[in-house]
Amino acid sequence: MSKSPITCHVLDSTLGKPAANVRVQLEALSPLNSQFHILATGETNSDGRCPDLLVGQSPKDVLVAKGVFKMTFFTGEYFAKAGRATFYPQVEILFQLTETPDAHYHIPLLLSPFSYTTYRGS
């Protein structure tokens, strides 16, 4: 079983703790028709991480060496379960891979009901 080449981590910055059970969807942009297609779906664990989006699949089988990808976090569902309102029902993060397909990419998301921040993690 190989390590997932793309991982994420969601932190609820208003509570100061990991955001568990956030549904996540990873998509790739097709260069042929400029449409996104789903590569994987998952859910953050109790530590707010989704380390196994593409586990068991070789990065070369799943990802191209270069390309545009989209990770969608279904934040409205997360906040609704907690009885909290949010301005952002989904957070979509588009990112571009420019390195070899065996590199690791980590997408952290710092989340609150009315703002979010992301960056290229390690």
Residue ranges and their predicted role:
Residues S2-Q96, H106:
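Beta-strand-dominated extracellular/periplasmic modules and repeats
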